[in-house]
């Protein structure tokens, strides 16, 4: 069924920034004593807010200083300002949604500044969302709670049950399920975590217009 609205995660869905951020994160956590296999870190940390990452990393054994979140954000912003490419096929998806007159928004656990840095590198991209760019950090509860997705649905004046969420993390897929929304899981490499949270996986953004019933 064609959705009435689409809500995108940002990192790893619109902009190919997640690998950049995660490489920096893994290296940084190692300096504070957390040396775990990458697959374990991805399973435990991807999709969380940075405050959530810090809390989880401490439970896993990282000896993080009190100012770690702010310090890491400074390093991350500096790295992302060097360039964060779009996920291939994203503009094709937005063009198809525009042609079908289907509204869309962003619902991310990333900070507003982070999204401004990554999205703002691509001319006209922020404007295409018409102010509908929302951070879970501005909500009462971030993902895996549904607050940011429900807020986005209200902003577009659509029933949550008619929305589709595009996510790449189990945390985000869980939030979509809690919001009563269908989740399409962008999974070019690993699908198990998204499947476990009820997402419908796909591997290429170029396939998404067809999967959404737009063509």
Regions from the language model: what does each represent?
Residues 2-10, 14-100, 113-116:
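N-terminal helical cap/lid subdomain that shapes the substrate entry/recognition surface
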Residues 59-64, 100-102, 180-181, 196-200:
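Short glycine/proline-enriched coil/turn segments at helix->beta-strand junctions
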Residues 24, 37, 53, 65-66, ...:
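Short linear functional motifs in flexible/disordered or boundary regions
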Residues 1-4, 95, 111-215:
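Asp-based, Mg2+/Mn2+-dependent phosphohydrolase catalytic module
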